[in-house]
Amino acid sequence: RHAGMLHHGDQVRPVLLNSWEGVYLDVNEPAMAEMMKDIAALGGELFVMDDGWFGDKYRRVQDNSSLGDWVVDRKKLPNGLENLIQTADRNGIKFGIWIEPEAVNSKSELFEKHPDWALQVKGRPLQYGRGGTQMLLDVCNPEVQDFMFGIVDNLLGKHPQIAYIKWDANVELKNYGSTYLPQDKQSH
């Protein structure tokens, strides 16, 4: 009966500015502050900081690293998310953030710790997607589910002022298999 209904579908969506086209992966505090000021001056209501804000051991300066390492890059954002959220508030707009928790790069702390969390066919070499390093996590695995939930829970728990999450899905499915599920539970 309610299939196809959009929650709050009768409400006007906020006018937003997403940082991606402005800076791509070169996220930094001055650029984010300037973009927030600009969208507020134009009457916008929401600023979304896109890809490029995270990474510790492996910094997100190209798209071949850091997916899975959802830690603020303090070299790019020395004052953390708190400062950006306050900047949005001072400009009278809301703050949003980009994540892609189902994805991982082979060059990431997450993959170093849990290579078995990537979708893969046992006995076959991993196939990489975008940038030659991207893979999807095996969401059949309860540990992966907990990890993904934890990303969102951690972000919103520490920063309840985050008003919007852009949950992206850029990685194509290359590895059709699970190291978690037994073979009889897989279709191949």
Predicted regions and their residues:
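Active-site neighborhood of glycoside hydrolase catalytic domains
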Residues: 73-80, 86-90, 112-188
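Active-site-proximal segment of RNA-dependent polymerases
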Residues: 9
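Beta-strand-rich recognition/accessory modules
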Residues: 1-6
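Short glycine/proline-rich turn/loop motifs
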Residues: 14-20, 129-133
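Aromatic- and glycine-enriched glycan-recognition loops and surfaces
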Residues: 21-112, 119, 146-150
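A sequence-level detector of short, solvent-exposed, charge-rich linear segments
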Residues: 14, 36, 51, 58, ...
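Structural preference for beta-strand elements that scaffold enzyme active sites
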Residues: 12-16, 45-46, 92-96, 162-166
